[in-house]
């Protein structure tokens, strides 16, 4: 996790010791709210939240989790006030959101898709570059009118520094070919993730961008691991 080097003082590895082969998959998130919140769009939600400060709680999978840091970034970019309620995983968090004890949860689409389709939760937007194939009716955050906010969990392959450049390039080419195979996309779709290959250089830029964004949010919100 990008958060680990920021939140933890001692790790058995450092990012600077690794060389990227390439990005392989990304997973978006969805901004889900309890239906008692009288909004149907992301713009309406932001406006309502600002008019009703102190009335919203948001769930996360735990301190330092993607949902925690991602929601703090959302708060910082929109000026919305929400109180953090950390859980140990998604199970109890979803149950409390369904019960209305907590009103907001930014989480993975598969974990709330059934509740969205049944009307027990409202999905206001997905946080990636594209719409989620299992929730095609839900707009992206950008489509919903909020620019500059993006929250994707991604997976990349790395090797140790010092690996010969020609080996890194060959591995990257092999990964690219594998990502282009039809069965790879089918398996990714079934898992609820998107195949997205990036070159080693592009992967480095993505890591630098997200690390800077997360570090800023973590510092501003004074986030600590349990």
List each language-model region with its residue ranges.
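Beta->alpha turn/N-cap motifs
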Residues: 1, 90, 107-112, 126-129, ...
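Hinge/capping helix and adjacent helix->loop/strand transition within the periplasmic-binding protein
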Residues: 2, 6-92, 141, 154-187
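Short beta-strand->loop
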Residues: 13-24, 59, 81-85, 103-104, ...
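Conserved functional loop/turn residues at catalytic and ligand-binding sites
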Residues: 41, 86, 100-101, 120, ...
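Non-transmembrane alpha-helical segments in soluble domains
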Residues: 43-46, 94, 98, 106, ...
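Alpha-to-beta junction loops
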Residues: 52-56, 80, 98-107, 120-123, ...
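Short helices/loops that flank or line small-molecule/ion binding pockets
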Residues: 73, 77, 91-101, 105, ...
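An extracytoplasmic/periplasmic, membrane-proximal ligand-sensing/linker region
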Residues: 77-80, 117, 140-143, 165-226
């Amino acid at each position: 996790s990008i958060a680990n080097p920021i939140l933890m003082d001692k790790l058995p590895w450092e990012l600077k010791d690794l060389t990227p082969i390439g990005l392989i998959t990304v997973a978006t998130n969805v901004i889900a709210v309890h239906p008692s919140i009288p909004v149907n769009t992301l713009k309406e939600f932001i406006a309502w939240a600002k008019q009703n400060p102190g009335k919203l709680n948001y769930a996360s999978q735990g301190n330092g989790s993607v949902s925690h840091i991602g929601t703090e970034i959302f708060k910082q970019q929109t000026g919305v006030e929400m109180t953090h309620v950390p859980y140990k995983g998604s199970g109890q968090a979803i149950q409390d959101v369904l019960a209305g004890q907590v009103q907001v949860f930014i989480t993975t689409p598969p974990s709330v898709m059934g509740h969205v389709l049944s009307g027990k939760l409202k999905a206001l937007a997905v946080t990636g570059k594209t719409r989620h194939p299992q929730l095609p009716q839900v707009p992206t955050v950008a489509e919903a009118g909020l620019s500059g906010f993006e929250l994707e969990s991604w997976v990349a392959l790395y090797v140790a520094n010092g690996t010969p450049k020609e080996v890194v390039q060959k591995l990257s080419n092999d990964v690219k070919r594998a990502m282009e195979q039809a069965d790879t996309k089918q398996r990714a779709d079934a898992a609820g993730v998107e195949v997205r290959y990036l070159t080693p250089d592009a992967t480095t830029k993505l890591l630098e961008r997200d690390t800077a964004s997360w570090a800023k949010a973590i510092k501003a919100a004074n986030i600590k691991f349990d």
